[in-house]
Design a protein with these regions (language model features):
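N-terminal secretory signal peptides
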Residues: 1-8, 33-34
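Active-site acidic/histidine proton-transfer and metal-coordination neighborhood
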Residues: 16-17, 21-24, 72, 107-200, ...
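C-terminal segment of N-terminal export signals and the immediately downstream linker at the start
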Residues: 28-67, 75
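Hydrophobic faces of well-ordered beta-strands that scaffold small-molecule active sites
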Residues: 56-61, 85-87, 115-120, 145-147, ...
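Conserved, mostly hydrophobic/aromatic
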Residues: 60, 77, 108, 137, ...
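Catalytic domains of carbohydrate-active enzymes, especially glycoside hydrolases
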Residues: 73-88, 140
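Gly/Pro-rich active-site loop or hairpin
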Residues: 74, 180, 184, 208-262, ...
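Glycine-rich, proline-tolerant flexible connector loops at the mouths of alpha/beta enzymes
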Residues: 86-103
Length: 295
C-alpha cells in the first residue's frame, strides 16, 4: 500500500454521502452473493475473547478492499466477521468539518465496524497539516496513525508534541526495500529517544521483502508496536495468501501474545483486488489455525 500525503476529503464528499445513505438503508445493491465464489464469507464469528481470534482484535487494512466503495468494503468486512478497521485514505479521506465527522461516524456506526487505525500518512515539519490529521483521528476515535514520517529532527519534534497533545499513537510503517524505514534498525533508532506513543506498524510482508525477520521486529519493538499488517511473501518478492509464504505466523502471534498486544491485528492482502474474498477466507482460516497453536 502506498503512502498518502495531505489527503483531504475534497472530491470524496459526494461519494461519502451516498455511501452513508446506502449503509443506513441497507441498500448496498452491488454486493450480492453472485459477486463472489462459493464458500465466500464462511467465517462469520466475531473476534471476541471467546471467538476464533482469541484476545486479538482481528481486523483488516481496508486497502485490501480498495476496489470496493467504502459502504461495500465495510459490509464485506462485517460479513467476514472482522469488526476492526484500519482505513486507507481512499476509503475515508481526512477531514475535520463537524458535519463530515458526523457523517463518517454514522457510516461506521451503522456498519458495526470500528475504525481504530488509519494510514499510511506522510508527515514532515508542517504543523498545520499534522494537526489536521491528528484532529481528524481524535474526532473519529482512531487510536493509531500508520505513518511514514520524514527522518529529520523537526518532524519528530512535531510528532512528539502531537502525540502528547492528542493522545493518538504514531506507528511508523516499514515499506520494503529502498524505503525510509526499510530495516528493523531504521524504526528502532527512529523511535527510541521519543515519546512512548511514537512506535511502529510492523508490516510483516514488507519486512520479508527487505529480508528482515518480522518476529525479530516484534521482539525488539515490543510495547512500541501500535499496529500490525499481516502479510505474507515468498522468496522476498512474491505476495502470497497468508500462511502460504515465508512468514512465521505462529511465531509472530506468540510475540504479540507475550507483549499483550491490544491494537488492531490487520490483515492486508494486496492480490486479486477485484475478487479478494475467497483468498481472504483462506487467510483468516490460517490465522485461526495459528492462534489455536498458541495454547
Amino acid at each position: 500500500m502506498r503512502e498518502y500525503r495531505n489527503v483531504s476529503r475534497r472530491g470524496f464528499l459526494k461519494a461519502g454521502a451516498v455511501a452513508t445513505a446506502a449503509v443506513c438503508s441497507g441498500a448496498v445493491s452491488s454486493l450480492s452473493p453472485s459477486s463472489f465464489s462459493p464458500g465466500s464469507f464462511s467465517l462469520m464469528a466475531a473476534d471476541t475473547a471467546a471467538g476464533p481470534y482469541g484476545s486479538f482484535k482481528m481486523g483488516i487494512q481496508s486497502y485490501t478492499l480498495r476496489d470496493f466503495k467504502v459502504a461495500e468494503a465495510l459490509e464485506i468486512s462485517k460479513k467476514l466477521g472482522l469488526h476492526y478497521w484500519e482505513s486507507f485514505p481512499g476509503h475515508i479521506p481526512i477531514g475535520t468539518v463537524p458535519k463530515y465527522i458526523a457523517e463518517q461516524n454514522e457510516l461506521l456506526g451503522a456498519s458495526g465496524v470500528k475504525l481504530v487505525a488509519y494510514g499510511v500518512v506522510g508527515f514532515d515539519g508542517n504543523e498545520s497539516k499534522a494537526r489536521e490529521v491528528f484532529e481528524f483521528a481524535k474526532k473519529i476515535g482512531i487510536e493509531s496513525i500508520s505513518a511514514d514520517p520524514n527522518k529529520d529532527e523537526a518532524t519528530f519534534k512535531l510528532l512528539d508534541k502531537m502525540v502528547e497533545e492528542y493522545g493518538v499513537n504514531i506507528a511508523i510503517h516499514n515499506h520494503g526495500p529502498g524505503a525510509k524505514y526499510d530495516k528493523i534498525d531504521d524504526v528502532v533508532n527512529a523511535v527510541k529517544d521519543h515519546n512512548p506513543r511514537i512506535g511502529a506498524c510492523v508490516d510483516t510482508g514488507h519486512y520479508l521483502r527487505s529480508k528482515e525477520n518480522p518476529v525479530e521486529a516484534l521482539e525488539r519493538l515490543k510495547d512500541r508496536v501500535f499496529g500490525v499488517h499481516l502479510k505474507d511473501v515468498k522468496d522476498a518478492k512474491i505476495f502470497k495468501i497468508l500462511g502460504e509464504g515465508d512468514l512465521d505466523l505462529v511465531g509472530c502471534l506468540k510475540i504479540l501474545q507475550r507483549i499483550k498486544y491490544k491494537y488492531c491485528l490487520a490483515l492486508e492482502y494486496e492480490e486479486n483486488p477485484k475478487n479478494p474474498v475467497p483468498d481472504i477466507d483462506i487467510c483468516l482460516a490460517n490465522v485461526q489455525k495459528a492462534i489455536a497453536k498458541l495454547g
